[in-house]
């Protein structure tokens, strides 16, 4: 069904995925329409392998194909479980974190918030910013290497899943042929074999002929159940197809996201940081030039002011005498006041001594009187 189908002829699984509303009856009809001559010959050959009343052969009919499909399902499950997408998401998150850790606005104080300027130095050294950018850039380069490995692995996974999808198509085609072959054999038994057995049993009335008819009817019932089992296997193949495509799409989206980050986000970040650093240097140069101009103007203003003050003070000093009249007056008043205070102090001392002498005489007289009184 696959090898001989023309390139412009859609595979039933592809048609099913693009037309989710298609029912099983329509799919079956499409399968019959798309059968090639080789498919019809294979159906005939497989149908002839079914021996009526051979229950062991019926049990093994299509079993090998179902075992391959079971192994195929486990293969898909193992592949999904072994490919943990967690590290990919973590690596992308790390990349976004590093890209956000150094923002061009952080370098430009004018674009920082008032609160941020309050708790952070207004101006950062160019060397500090450049060193920080180099450190982050090195970390981003290491993350980029990891992302490249993830992207390569995801690309390989997409190719591997595409191979699994093609295998699933092959399983679908084969199980469909087995179903059609079993249905062909069932129709042959119902329309030819059983009517012949019934006619023979009716004519002979032999109990063994009647039992042979019943056995054949039981065989048809078991054949019908086997067909149903194979239809379930085909349904698994139908459901597996969109699951494989879904995993492929997720892997492809992640690979594209990684490639976009490597080829777009990272170069854009580096360009913006280079531009921000250049603008910072320009701003610092303008600030330095402004500082030189302001300092020059300030020095000229201060020198002119000092020259004016010195000229005025020098002229005033030249007009003054060696000793000011006011100074002489103050000095003379201080001398006179000192002499007067000295004379007053001497007079006060003299008076105090006279009073002390009188008190001493009184004390001496009092002592003598007490001594005389003690002798009597």
Curated annotation (Swiss-Prot):
One Pfam short name: TelA
Give the record's family classification: Belongs to the TelA family.
Q: What is this protein called?
A: TelA-like protein SE_1089
Stored InterPro entries: Toxic_anion-R_TelA
